């Protein structure tokens, strides 16, 4: 199913359809001309272009010049779906602007919002979300970085963060550290830290199979005003989970965009490639692969936009729905893209061919913002928790 067909679903209103149509036209006219060779420059160029085009307004609330009253998850998902179909780095640039500011939008003071959101909205500043550590990725409660009091109005952050998207080019980081109010998850707090703060350094740039700016950060006595805290003391886990609750569905949307493009490339290839004197598409095994991919694309779209719609209707949390969307869409996209590579034959593993690029792009999505295995645990726990609640009600 194409995006146009998806937009006919009742999940969307006319505002979503206008946004999608405008972004798609802009992307088709703009993205191909942006630089690709220098990774940092390419990412900066995409942030600037998205800001100038007005599309980063989707990651900022209306009170600070944004597009919607709050963070409209359907709009965020549509943007990632559309951008991923065309250019993985553009999807990344959009997504990280949102992930690196959502915590500020949701939990920041009026002063923090006024300071950090407008530059991101306009593409003048680059945002980042610094959660993962060498020994704490999906297990957020195991974070070891500390933020200790330094006088009455400051804290000092010490520790290491790794796998930080936009690391090395960001203007600010949303950083999570242990402040010690309680053991485990309840002892974390979140802060906005400017990239040029003394003691904050990039200790390593990390190269991955689908290149994007990624780094390990070192915090050595990084002095941060207490006013830069997001939420209250000990609210860090809540801040992280609320942010991921919004953006986890959008990871599924990016996977959906990659899968849509792979299916498009597969259909075009199967129709035009001659094999044994006839189009590849006439072989039943080819038709079976196309049918499986098309079904998985549609199922992914339903899960992604169901989760986004549910959140936008006012649900406090969509933990189960977002986990299902991310888990299914990323795993399905891997299968869809793998079939596309196979049906392209030798071209499928040739650098510069679109399906080869997609094969590298999709792999990380099954890991970041909660690996597939973690999503399975989350889904099961949500179901078991709900069952326990119903059992208690039945016993009364």
Each PLM stretch: what is its role?
Residues 154, 158-201:
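A short core secondary-structure module
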Residues 145-148:
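A structural signal for short hydrophobic beta-strand segments in well-ordered beta-sheet cores
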Residues 220-239:
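Long, acidic (Asp/Glu-rich), low-complexity accessory segments flanking structured domains
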